[in-house]
Amino acid sequence: MKELELKYGCNPNQKPSKIYIGENKELPIQVLSGKPGYINFLDAFNGWQLVKELKKATGLPAATSFKHVSPAGAAVGLPLDKTMAQIYWVDDLGELSPLACAYARARGADRMSSFGDFIALSDVCDVATAKIIKREVSDGVIAPGYEPEALEILKQKKKGNYNIVQIDPLYMPAPIEHKEVYGITFEQGRNELDINRELLAHVVTENQEIPDSAKIDLIISLITLKYTQSNSVCFAKDGQAIGIGAGQQSRIHCTRLAGSKADNWFLRQSPNVLGLQFVDGIGRADRDNSIDLYIGEDYMDVLEEGIWQNIFKVKPDIFTMEEKKEWLEQMTDVALGSDAFFPFGDNIERAHKSGVKYIAQPGGSVRDDNVIDTCNKYHMAMAFTGIRLFHH
């Protein structure tokens, strides 16, 4: 297949639309089910690069959950403990494969943003992973292959119209890429930068210790940022992104957004949330929305008389600000990556509130000294990578 016609481009009025490589070359994909759209393929091809690089950098199966050309979550296949399995809604599935754990983590980090995601998997999709995907609201998946039973499970989604794409894992794009805006062609070399432990060698803080587990988290955050719309900041812990602040025009707003998402991820692990008793038959999306409201400032939207009875079997107590603060103080050893330098120490102050202890950023600000001093204030370890990771 040398080209694939699409229903339309970004919007229904943008016709005609198609994908192709040029020079009469074959596309490196097969569409096994469904009719993926323009934005689906943008998500798929960005996501595939992300998980391919995560697998190369860590040696572990990887997954990402994409929405509107930025990842909502990304992770490698570390095992889930009982609490993680519960908050990711996979505790009823028994033992999970490493790839299934990776997708459960990627989808579970920010379930509100991942609703209707496009999934990318680094490895052949197995049955355990397909079972998780089947019951989530998702637009499609791209992987280097599918086990026969897994493919049959996925084909049952959306009445047989679920988008399933298989990509040639050996495909290598041309070293020069092009983009057209307003009839004008932009050309640049592909971002072939290898993100690995060597980038974390230049530690500029008094605390010089970055353990191996934190290095993996920093690598995950940086690779995630490489395929996130800029400006962007990523919080990571235990082999996964836990908060991604994408597409903001100021660095501090990236950090605040990513930090608030990381806080929500940790609040969902609190006894207050784990003890919620939902009514029988409530949908997964309704459950996610209710939790999001319950842990936020608008908690009365789910606790008002006449409303909570439709959601919970037993009316929950209010999760007070004091209780949330006390719980969040237990969040530690979080890693943070930034796609460009921090211009002010306020980013570090905000990061500290969400348990950040390890940071990787390019460096190069005229106020680097202030940023380093703020890290030293909290005994953080920060590496200057010397590389920027803008993505547009």
Describe each PLM feature range.
Residues 1-199, 214-232:
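Active-site loops and adjacent core secondary-structure elements that bind or stabilize anionic groups
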Residues 53, 227, 264-268, 353, ...:
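Conserved helix-loop functional segments at active or binding sites
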Residues 70, 125, 237-240, 342, ...:
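Active-site-proximal loop/turn and secondary-structure-junction residues that shape catalytic pockets
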